[in-house]
Amino acid sequence: MNIQLIKNFNPILKINTQSSNIKLNKIIPNEWLFILMNTGSFTQNLNSLLISDININISQKYNYNQPQQFHNTRTVWLANNNNQRFAFAQSRWIIKNNYTNYLNLLNNKPIGKSFIINETDLHKKIEEIYCGHSYILEKNFQSQQLIWGRKYTLLYNKKSFIVIQEYFSPNLTKFLKFH
């Protein structure tokens, strides 16, 4: 299975949202602030913005090597019906003990949708916001503008079990204009 991780993202701005006293609205454009700080389902928001279904291309790699522990790496491209890509996400799951309860969440659906279907209550803790350049992302987004992204942790029962990094196409701002 082809797991494509973004290792060569070159940030020119990186903000730790947990320890920063920076007023984000002073340095991040409103269009991006809306996307980056939203704690809801990005896939659902993208469906609403584009008023069309989003195609999801998922690759996963499982690792059961350690007893009582489960590892999963998952990459996702979100695109419209014309195969225009709007977001790339990579997630790393480390689940200790009783990981079989989580296996039904690992399907070809967006993570948020899986949790909604399984009625799992989560909290999204946004940890970092960044913008920069990446040849791979610029090629896939068909844009050489700055790429914004974020890193967050999903918490279940106040415990971290999934870390997600998302990178967003600069073309998204065409659908979000705040004046």
UniProtKB/Swiss-Prot annotation:
Q: Which domain of life is it from?
A: Eukaryota
Matches recorded under InterPro entries: Chorismate_lyase_/UTRA_dom_sf, Rv2949c-like
What SUPFAM superfamilies does this protein map onto? Chorismate lyase-like
Going by the UniProt record, its keywords in alphabetical order are:
Chloroplast, Plastid
The record's GO CC annotations read:
chloroplast
Q: Which Pfam families match?
A: Rv2949c-like
Coiled-coil parts of chain: none
Where does it localize? Plastid, Chloroplast
Regarding protein family, the annotation reads:
Belongs to the ycf21 family.
Could you tell me what this protein is called?
Answer: Uncharacterized protein ycf21
Q: What organism does the record attribute this protein to?
A: Antithamnion sp.
